[in-house]
Amino acid sequence: MFRLISFCWVLLLANPSQGQDINVLLKEASNFERVQKENEALEKYKLVLTQDPVNIKALVKSAELSASIGGRQGDKNNKRLFYETALAYAKRAWQADSNHADAAYAMAMISGRMTDIETENKQIVAYVKDIKSYSDKALSINPDHGKANYTLGKWHYEMVTLSGLKKAAVKLFYGGLPSGDLEKAISFMEKCKTLEPYFALNYLDLAKAYKEARQPAKAIEVLNKLVKLPVRTGDDPAIKAEGAKMLEAIQ
């Protein structure tokens, strides 16, 4: 018995608590994100998931980072691979805890990304519906979830401005176009701006919504703030550049 107890103590000393290891990995991942090393951050979150497969933070972050990295891929097949991987992480988060606002947001976020690569009309419409339903779910859990406010605002904006094949598909399979509302788009994205003041993509799409609403002064105000934002993610340089180009065109 004494030998068994001694052996157990050796194992405990050799392997620090799983929770401590996970906290260290999460901190390291966050540090990589702060310096825009998204691939390295993603690998750290994956390591967390090897120890805790239902860790919501790691699953949601893995979904976000996979989507972000995928969005910058020039090759369509690589983009699809990253997006489908992001969708798998989001689904795991949702299955782990469907009452977690971050899990619902992750499903809404990646559903939006999937509409950009999906070619089957019925599936495009299914993703469009999912953006709305999962955003609504996230906000029913936490009305102050910044990125869920953005995602729902973007959904309203896109329902107003849909064009081309995506518009035709939504009209055909949705039973008419959903009731997008430009005022709601602006309201949700303005709330996100308050809750997530460094989320560059929200500024860009909010400016587009103001432009669509024929409020150029408001669009210019938002764009002026966007171009002054610090770079926080790998997507930010391109977002800020697009904002600067849009600002030049409006002024």
Which role fits each region the language model picked out?
Residues 162-173, 179, 196-201, 220-222, ...:
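Terminal, low-structured helical/coil segments at or just beyond the last alpha-helical repeat
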Residues 32-40, 65-99, 109-144, 154-192, ...:
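Short coil/linker segments at helix-helix boundaries
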Residues 5-14:
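Bacterial N-terminal signal peptides
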Residues 17-71:
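N-terminal leader/linker segments that initiate helical-solenoid repeat arrays
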